[in-house]
Regions:
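Extended, charge-enriched "interface" segments that sit outside catalytic cores
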Residues: 1-69, 339-345, 349, 437-447
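Glycine-rich phosphate/diphosphate-binding loops that line cofactor/substrate pockets in enzymes
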Residues: 59-73, 125-134, 252-263, 314-319
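Glycine-rich phosphate-binding loops that contact phosphosugars or nucleotide phosphates
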Residues: 65, 69-240, 427
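Structural beta-sheet core signal
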Residues: 77, 136-138, 174, 267, ...
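Flexible loop/turn segments at secondary-structure boundaries
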Residues: 83-86, 119-121, 144-147, 180-184, ...
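Active-site phosphate/pyrophosphate-binding segments
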Residues: 161-324, 415-447
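Helicase-primase coupling helices
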Residues: 299-385
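C-terminal helical cap and adjacent loop that interface with cofactors, partners, or active-site loops
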Residues: 366-429
Length: 447
């Protein structure tokens, strides 16, 4: 279960204010639980942990087993935004930090494509595919989103040229709409196996659907434990009490923002395994809250690394932020610092200590320094990093996001702003149907 500690904010806010925002948070909680708020047709994520059928989990595992029998050692997962960040986060968090160099896991390497339009990246992906035994998961509800569609066209061509059309079809799985769209049509024509992106689950809330479950199980991890951890968190957050961690988090972040003008939230971790937790979290909160000229800007750092760069700004820069630290209470590994007879580095005072003890003291020292410097700090903690705790963490942040956005007064489940750049890009690429926009944008650029 995820725990929260808001004590690092207590010297910055009044108790009466926090109680007021707890009341606002409980009102928003009621809206979310009653499914009566804006965007209530996109609440399918709420019960995924408790309602995901065994048949779906087994189907994901069947793909894993089939590709293992085909000796697949590279899976290219194609998707953008919520179609890849959750899976990327889980795989990075659960993998050996040097898995690529060691190649001892027994599971295929999972790489991601379709999340950018870099020609160098795509070209280097082709280089990798030419020397590996490849399969592909393509994730797109429509099949026409530019970045993943471009990547899939290229990967599909490689698979068909390398293995032939029939074998290529066995090496492609599509995660897409149940009934419509270009990718669904192509999958039916070519005979690809398909999984469904539920209509009532938005992309950034989709990590516990096949969008996340399939890549995670292909990477060799236990999606049953992931769902079990999320289910326990679902049950915990269903209890309406002042110890509801999601309510506490949503209340404090909105209090700091609305009353004290803290416009930036920095998600902090003290392990590089959580770098992509920050990326997933930024999309979740940025797209859910950043609209109607409102929102808290989500940023992320990995300490102690970033203490030697952004730490200066956090300590002494503009007082526009607060921190939310994701704490891992116990390490999965054990390394003890040894003694050195010469002690030239003057570290013998640490001899016999675990490296994680040094990390914990760095975390505590940073907390005290940043609070002294005027930066409020919340702490979200899990017992250790594994599939179960990661599932709980995913669900916690998703649920809290819904509550927080309703406090803010915005629809957590739409993202109207992401279409603006696409319209300009289509006009500049002279996509059919955009002739008038092309003419207008060319005139604008010639001024």
């Amino acid at each position: 279960m995820v725990k929260i500690n808001v004590g690092g904010c207590s010297s910055f806010v009044k108790d009466s204010e926090y109680k007021e925002y707890l009341e606002k948070a409980f009102a928003a909680y009621d809206v979310l639980e009653s499914e009566s708020g804006a965007g209530n047709d996109f609440l399918g994520w709420k019960h995924l942990p408790s309602q995901t059928p065994e048949s779906l989990v087994k189907a994901c595992e069947d793909v894993r087993d089939d590709w293992k029998n085909r000796n697949v050692d590279l899976v290219v997962v194609i998707g953008i935004g919520g179609s890849y960040l959750g899976a990327k986060c889980a795989i990075e968090a659960l993998s050996h930090s040097f898995a690529r160099e060691m190649r001892q896991s027994g599971a295929p390497e999972v790489v991601f494509a379709g999340n950018n339009l870099s020609e160098e990246y795509v070209s280097e992906l082709i280089d990798l595919m030419t020397v590996r035994n490849v399969a592909c998961v393509v994730i797109s509800k429509s099949g026409t989103t530019t970045e993943p569609a471009v990547a899939f066209r290229i990967v599909k061509q490689h698979l068909e040229e390398t293995y032939g059309q029939k074998e290529a079809a066995a090496r492609i799985v599509a995660v897409t709409d149940a009934h419509k769209g270009a990718l669904k049509t192509l999958s039916t024509q070519e005979g690809y196996r398909t999984f469904v992106v539920p209509d009532n689950v938005g992309g950034r809330f989709s990590v516990l659907t096949p969008v996340g479950l399939l890549p995670i199980v292909l990477a060799g991890f236990d999606i049953r434990a992931l769902l079990e951890g999320a289910k326990e968190e679902e049950m915990a957050l269903a209890e309406k009490s002042e110890k509801n961690a999601a309510v506490e988090y949503a209340a404090m972040r909105n209090l700091l923002h609305s009353v004290y003008g803290k416009s930036v939230e920095v998600l902090v971790s003290f392990t590089p395994k959580f770098q992509y937790l920050g990326e997933w979290w930024k999309q979740l909160y940025g797209e859910s809250e950043g609209k109607d000229k409102k929102g808290i800007y989500p940023a992320s750092v990995v300490y102690t690394t970033d203490l030697h760069s952004l730490g200066q700004f956090v300590q002494d820069g503009a007082r526009i932020m607060y921190e939310t630290v994701v704490t891992v209470e116990n390490s999965n590994r054990s390394v003890v610092i040894g003694s050195d007879p010469q002690n030239l580095d003057q570290l013998n005072y640490l001899a016999g200590q675990h490296v994680e003890h040094c990390n914990a003291m760095a975390q505590l020292g940073t907390k005290l320094a940043h609070i002294d410097g005027g930066v409020p700090q919340m702490e979200v903690s899990i017992e250790r990093i594994n599939e179960k705790t990661l599932g709980a963490l995913f669900y916690f942040f998703e649920f809290a996001c819904g509550v927080s956005a309703y406090i803010l007064g915005v629809n957590p489940f739409n993202q109207p702003g992401v279409e603006a750049y696409k319209k300009n890009m289509f006009a500049l690429l002279e996509k059919p149907g955009f002739e008038e926009q092309t003419k207008a944008i060319k005139a604008r650029l010639s001024e």
